[in-house]
Amino acid sequence: MKKIIILLTTFFLLSGCTIPRAVFKSSLINQDDPRYNLVEVTPTLKLSAPDTVPKTIVDPVFAANNWHWTSLAKGDVLHITILSSGGAGYLSNNASGDRADFENILVTDSNTVQVPYAGTIPVSGLDVTQLADEIKKRLSRVVLNPQVIVTLTARTGAMVTVEGSGKTGRYPLEQSMNRLSHLLATAVAVENTSTDMMEVHVTRQQHYFTARLSDIYQYPGLDIALQPDDRITLRQVTEYVNVLGAAGVQGKHALVQRHSSVVDALALAKGLNDNLADPQAIFLYKHNEAEQAKQQMRKLNIYHVDMSQPNSVFLAQAIRVDNGDVIYISNASLTDFAKVKAAFDSFLTRGTNSF
């Protein structure tokens, strides 16, 4: 009789207690709440689709291809050979008969070269063949039938700089590497990088160009021609989605692609917790929309996804998740009952063992 009295007393004590919930219930969400609009995700819901074409506007400075990879640039080092049937030995100490050689001719910062008896020659926009023709024309006044050969011995002038997340360093511009995609193929370790989450910045004097690596590979208009002294900065883009509540793994999860969906985010969180989650009560809070709602003084939209429906996966795949968004998974109704039962069983066991 005494045992029965204790058990009944324990039951009535528990009936007056409430078990704290880790998350709120779906029943607490009100369609008419003055603070937000509850938007049901259904096949008829029309949301703005993610941009499939990048909005990057290429500055005309980058669109113009006014420098060719064969053009000489400041810092280049040349070897000039002059041949003449009338003798060229007097042109240089490094001469033999009808041949004179000039080594280590440097293209100066003013884009000129200094050639004995030919004077100072501007080389902007010239390649080695055009420079040889100009030297030949100038020497024809002092040398009989001159023949000029210009060789590029060190390509130290036409260089671009790579910094940031890639293989940093200085890279020469040449025939096989004169566009942005050529350089990125060398400077980026793609096997360890999501091209969708890599941002490329190009600085040219006071002008700037920015695009995602995947867009540069996909859209030819973004594959700009490089010029000497361009500075390329590679930056890994890190974006997160917060998955809270009855998820497999709660917390902040890094997105692995730009246009992620609710399904992608749930996969990062190891799905729903089978023992706790209510698949009918998944809510999406969009960070950008929250900021817009505050600025426009309107109610915030909260999107409700019912993953218990057969077509729910397709609907969830159509809902885009962006950086800073929050996905909340509610507890199932039976979860509270399970907590009460566990607590009651614990008291029951203690009461029985005390006798």
Swiss-Prot record:
NCBIfam families: PRK15175.1. This is Vi polysaccharide export protein VexA/TviF. GO terms for cellular component: cell outer membrane; pore complex. The keyword Membrane applies. The gene is vexA. A lipid is attached at C17 (N-palmitoyl cysteine). May form an ATP-driven capsule polysaccharide export apparatus, in association with the VexB, VexC and VexD proteins. May function as a membrane anchor for the polysaccharide. Possible porin properties. It holds the Pfam family Poly_export. Keywords: Capsule biogenesis/degradation, Cell outer membrane, Ion transport, Lipoprotein, Membrane, Palmitate, Polysaccharide transport, Porin, Signal, Sugar transport, Transmembrane, Transport. It is found in: Cell outer membrane. GO terms for biological process: monoatomic ion transport. It comes from Salmonella typhi. A lipid is attached at C17 (S-diacylglycerol cysteine). It comes from the Bacteria. Residues 1-16 form the signal peptide. Belongs to the BexD/CtrA/VexA family. InterPro entries: Poly_export, Poly_export_N. GO terms for molecular function: polysaccharide transmembrane transporter activity; porin activity.
